[in-house]
C-alpha cells in the first residue's frame, strides 16, 4: 500500500509556567494559565439566565515588535463580544447614508 511521506513541522515545546483551574460544581468555573514565552489566558464563568454559560476573560501575547497585545471577551445571552485596540472599528456612517437606511427600512 502506498503511503506518501509527510514532513511534520519542527515545533519547539513551550512550557506552561502556571495552570490554575476550578469548577465549583454549580456552574461557576475559572481558569488561567501562562506560558514561558508570555501567552497569558484567564477566564471565569457562571450560569446564565437562559441556561447558557456566561464567560468573560482575556488573553495576552507578545507581538513581534515586543509590545503586548490583549483581547478581553464576554459571551452571554447577548452573544460574543471582544474588546481590544487590535480590533478595527468601523467609521461612522455619514448622515445621508443613515437617512437612506431609515428610508429603506420604512419601505418594507
Curated annotation (Swiss-Prot):
UniProt name for this protein: Cuticle protein AM1199
Tissues expressing the protein: Arthrodial membrane.
Keywords of the record: Cuticle, Glycoprotein, Pyrrolidone carboxylic acid
PANTHER family (alphabetical): CUTICLE PROTEIN (PTHR10380), CUTICULAR PROTEIN 47EF, ISOFORM C-RELATED (PTHR10380:SF173)
GO cellular component: chitin-based extracellular matrix
Residue ranges annotated for the Chitin-binding type R&R domain, each copy included: 26-91
Entry-linked Pfam families: Chitin_bind_4
Highest classification ranks of the organism: Eukaryota, Metazoa, Ecdysozoa, Arthropoda, Crustacea
GO molecular function: structural constituent of chitin-based larval cuticle
Modified sites of kind Pyrrolidone carboxylic acid: 1
Residues glycosylated per entry: 89
Organism the protein comes from: Cancer pagurus
Amino acid at each position: 500500500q502506498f503511503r506518501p511521506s509527510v514532513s511534520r513541522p519542527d515545533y519547539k515545546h513551550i512550557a506552561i509556567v502556571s495552570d490554575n483551574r476550578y469548577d465549583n460544581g454549580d456552574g461557576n468555573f475559572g481558569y488561567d494559565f501562562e506560558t514561558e514565552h508570555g501567552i497569558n489566558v484567564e477566564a471565569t464563568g457562571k450560569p446564565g439566565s437562559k441556561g447558557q454559560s456566561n464567560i468573560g476573560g482575556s488573553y495576552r501575547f507578545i507581538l513581534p515588535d515586543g509590545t503586548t497585545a490583549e483581547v478581553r471577551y464576554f459571551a452571554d445571552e447577548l452573544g460574543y463580544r471582544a474588546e481590544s485596540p487590535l480590533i478595527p472599528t468601523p467609521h461612522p456612517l455619514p448622515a445621508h447614508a443613515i437617512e437612506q437606511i431609515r428610508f429603506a427600512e420604512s419601505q418594507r
